[in-house]
Amino acid sequence: VDLKTGARVEGDLNPSSDTETHLELYNKFPNIGGVVHTHSRWATIYAQAGRDIPALGTTHGDYFYGAIPCTRKMTPEEIGGVPGHYERETGKVIVETFEGKDPDAIPAALVHSHGPFVWGKSPADAVYNAVVLEELACMAWQNQLMDRDIPPMQQELLDKHYLRKHGKDAYYGQGKH
């Protein structure tokens, strides 16, 4: 699809019914090159509960620089309207949720009562981030079963794990991807 208009530019199939959401993200988050929307079990559980996925351990910190936020509930006005309106408003609610947050460092959002939208530098990167998100959601759920009031990981540990892999002086792993 054309990222400005949403018009199909090749192929015979219609684009996703969530194209307007994707376009809002592409146009507001300039570094993304792919968007994935799933209804994966564990991340959707958090979305339906209206809860962020907390950063509880180093696995989370290796990929996401903080809690994965859940949007507010959408208003009846945002949900109603002509075809495409709801989907465009969904994108706007995600963008609103990221005011003061870095969408490159936290490449996912949970849409309240709906499910996750995940992005990356490329379509493959977005899919990878969606797989990681689902594993983090499952791990967080299990941790919260053990301790409902489990605190988030130490900020210093989150900084170390995220920045050694993604920071300007990254040294961990096989290079930036």
Q: Where are the model-predicted features located?
A:
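Glycine-rich flexible loops
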Residues: 1-177
